[in-house]
């Protein structure tokens, strides 16, 4: 375990070259006395497998201007990584729920399939799944395939990028699993980090053009508990009768190694994939770094004067 501060000044504990599941993380971090991680009275919650095909990049006004000016993404603060997160869609939740039910109850009848009510979205309440942003008022959402293709052409001379298990980072209430994407030309530089494999027991893997994410803690605030009725081959979300429990939540970050390059996209694609986000609470960016919707509309019109399409708002999963 190593300690440090991230670029925003927050204390962090991290384990390089590993994606530690919560059981292992609790053991590794037992001396830290993290009151959220070490909680034991957490209601039962589902462990789905999400097949994610989109990435998101949140930013504030200053970042948006830079992205438009350069028509792409570069690392701030003289760094070498451009950071994205997995962007889970409503279809991803629906598919994950179906897989979870099929795996748990493989012998369901057609009648039981039809009786089953949707439940998984009630557990998808952590910031990982939110339409709100902790980082700024602007969110770019791109197909994963498009990002990787642009990275391949611009940073890898057309070759396939390499993916590695970069690290696990623990904050007070947040666990971040980081995947590193780099050029084959930098194999030696990152050889100390294991390759990201298609391991069905891992927190995250990559297969067939998508990230397969198995969230360790998808709720943050536990308002529901998973109710399993094996005699009926059914699952449901039951309301928690006692006070709601707060727990750690996890997410997956994808760090693209670009050096001092700009990962470029067509300006029209940037505009099409841009949406406005309301501020999450608590936020990471400063309060004055967020903008209201009218301010955002004006800025986007200024930066894309030839595009008259209205600025859309990020929408909730539910």
Summary of predicted features, one role per range:
Residues 2-318:
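NAD-dependent ADP-ribosyltransferases
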């Amino acid at each position: 375990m190593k300690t440090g501060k991230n670029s925003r000044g927050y204390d962090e504990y991290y384990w390089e070259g590993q994606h530690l599941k919560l059981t292992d993380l609790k053991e590794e971090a037992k001396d830290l006395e993290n009151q959220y991680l070490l909680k034991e009275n957490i209601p039962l919650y589902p462990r789905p497998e999400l097949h994610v095909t989109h990435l998101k990049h949140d930013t504030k006004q200053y970042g948006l201007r830079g992205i438009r000016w350069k028509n792409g993404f570069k690392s701030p603060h003289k760094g070498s990584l451009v950071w994205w997160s997995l962007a889970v869609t409503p279809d991803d939740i629906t598919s994950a729920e179906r897989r979870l039910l099929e795996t748990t109850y493989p012998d369901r009848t057609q009648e039981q399939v039809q009786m089953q009510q949707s439940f998984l979205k009630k557990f998808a309440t952590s910031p990982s799944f939110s339409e709100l942003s902790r980082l700024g008022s602007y969110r770019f959402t791109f197909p994963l395939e498009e990002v990787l293709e642009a990275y391949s052409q611009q940073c890898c001379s057309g070759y396939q990028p390499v993916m590695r298990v970069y690290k696990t980072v623990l904050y007070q209430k947040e666990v971040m699993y980081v995947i590193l994407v780099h050029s084959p030309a930098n194999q030696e530089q990152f050889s100390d980090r294991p390759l990201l494999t298609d391991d069905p027991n891992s927190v995250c893997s990559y297969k067939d053009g998508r990230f397969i994410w198995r969230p360790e803690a998808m709720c943050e605030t536990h308002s529901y508990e998973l109710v399993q009725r094996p005699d009926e081959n059914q699952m449901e979300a039951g309301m928690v009768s006692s006070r709601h429990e707060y727990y750690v939540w996890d997410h997956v970050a994808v760090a693209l190694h670009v050096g001092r390059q700009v990962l470029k996209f067509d300006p029209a694609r940037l505009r099409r994939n841009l949406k406005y986000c309301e501020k999450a609470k608590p936020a990471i960016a400063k309060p004055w770094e967020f903008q209201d919707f009218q301010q955002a509309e004006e800025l986007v019109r200024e930066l894309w004067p030839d595009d008259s399409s209205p600025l859309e708002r990020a929408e909730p999963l539910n």
